[in-house]
Structure formats: C-alpha cells, structure tokens
C-alpha cells in the first residue's frame, strides 16, 4: 500500500459527522446494531439502507482478500491502496452506491458529489489510485480520526471495515471490501429474509464464526432517522418534507411499534411541528 493513515473507530456519532462532512444529507445517520439477533434491528430506524462492519482479521484473511468478482458494472467499487483507509472506503462504498441507486441525494458540490462525477468510467483499481492521491479525503480522514475516543495505535492494525448493501435484484447481500478484486455476493439464509436479517446472517456465518470468542465486532446501520423522530417516545419533531409518502410514514411507525395501540401515528395523534 502506498501510504498509511490512522484507523477510524466504529463510533456512529463520529461516522455520521464524517459522512455529513463529505456530503451525506443530514436526514441520514449511523446507528449501533447491538447484536446479530433479530431484536437488535427493532432498535434501529427502518428501512436500513446499508451496513458497516468492523471485524478482527483472522489467519486466513490474507488468502480471502484476493476474492471478489471483478464484474461490477452496476456497483460503485474501489480498491484500497492506503493502509488503514478501510473505514473511509467502507463509508464511501455505502454512500456512493446509495447515491447510484437514487436512495440518497448528496449535498450539492460536496466532496462526495464531486468524487462521484470524477470516478465515473474508472475501473476499481484506478478509483483506488485516485483516492490514494487525493489530499482532500486524506485531510478529512485525519480530522475525524483525531476526534475519536479510542487510543490510536501507530502499530499494525488487525481489524478491518467493510460495507454491505442490498442487491438490486433479489435478496442477495453485497459485500464491499477494498482489499478484494470486486464485490462479494452472499446468498441469504432464506429467500424471504429482508436485507437487515440477511446481513446479520452473513455476519454470523462468514465473520463471527471465524473468531467466535473475539469481542471486537462492531455493526453499524445507515438509515433515515424519521422513524425515530416520528416515534411517540421521541422528544424531537419531524421535518416538513419527508422523502417518502404518508403511507410509508405510517408503515415505518407501525413496524417500529409492532402494532401497539399506544402508537400516536396509528391513533392519528401525530405531534405538531
């Protein structure tokens, strides 16, 4: 790898701040996923757009990093050529692919909006080289890692960030790891699993099973936070313009409350602005 940055920590507040600095809109944020059991997803605003995973590297990861499909015409993918840049690359993988699928709209003239235009037509290798030479993203990474609460190590780091996004077609989970040649496609545990459950199943099968006694796993979910804002126990109020119709707004709250009769949306008692 050409040079080295200091590692990021798996802190949802810091990564949300970082993503907004780069150009993600303020209505999208990261949330901790506290378990790989299904109940943990009930604590996170839905629908979940993408996941980040920080995991400990195992002895066979050197061989595994050569995997991945080089064919990724419908996915924004880049290689990692800067040591410890995995957190930034995982974040960019999530952001760029959500924008590619029109699931989010970047802040106009933001870093990531300009980057998205600059890397069009480049293959994953050239995108990685482009990123490794870009001083603006290096400075942004350095700025956010200095705000972390963890003790920063200058030695060898044995944890790694990757991203997961949903497939455009079917219930396949797509893993994006900058060490690999391209995306990795994971079949879900069952065909009926929604994206969130399918990702947790992949994390259990493909990652935790290799280091079952290691506690250095962190899972972060990226989603709009309207379902939390709209929830009756929230002290916040929702914004005037939501990026989905009122029927979807009801659906989010029904899922959040699991049909509770006390839900203010279900009873029509929507808090005023």
Residue ranges: model-predicted function:
Residues 1-238, 243-273:
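Cysteine-dependent deubiquitinase/ubiquitin-like isopeptidase catalytic cores across multiple families
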């Amino acid at each position: 790898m050409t040079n080295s940055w200091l590692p990021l920590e798996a802190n949802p507040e810091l990564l949300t701040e970082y993503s907004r600095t780069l150009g993600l809109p303020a209505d999208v944020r990261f949330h901790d996923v506290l378990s790989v059991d299904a109940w943990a997803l009930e604590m996170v605003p839905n629908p979940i757009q993408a996941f980040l995973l920080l995991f400990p590297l195992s002895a066979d990861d050197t061989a595994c990093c050569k995997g991945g499909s080089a064919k990724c015409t419908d996915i924004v993918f880049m290689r990692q050529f800067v040591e410890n840049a995995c957190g930034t690359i995982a974040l960019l993988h999530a952001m760029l692919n959500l924008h590619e699928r029109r699931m989010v709209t970047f802040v106009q003239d933001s870093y990531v909006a300009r980057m998205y235009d600059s890397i069009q037509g480049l293959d994953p290798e050239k995108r990685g080289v482009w990123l490794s030479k870009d001083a603006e993203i290096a400075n942004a990474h350095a700025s956010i890692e200095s705000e972390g609460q963890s003790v920063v190590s200058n030695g060898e780091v044995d944890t790694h960030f990757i991203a997961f996004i949903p497939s455009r077609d079917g219930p396949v989970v797509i893993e994006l790891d900058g060490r690999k040649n391209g995306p990795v496609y994971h079949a879900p545990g069952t065909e009926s699993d929604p994206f969130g459950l399918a990702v947790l199943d992949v994390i259990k099968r493909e990652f935790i099973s290799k280091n079952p006694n290691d506690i250095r796993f962190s899972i972060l979910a990226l989603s709009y936070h309207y379902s939390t804002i709209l929830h009756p126990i929230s002290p916040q109020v929702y914004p005037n313009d939501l990026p989905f119709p009122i029927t979807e707004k009801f659906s989010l709250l029904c899922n959040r409350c699991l049909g509770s009769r006390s839900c203010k949306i279900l009873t029509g008692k929507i808090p005023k602005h």
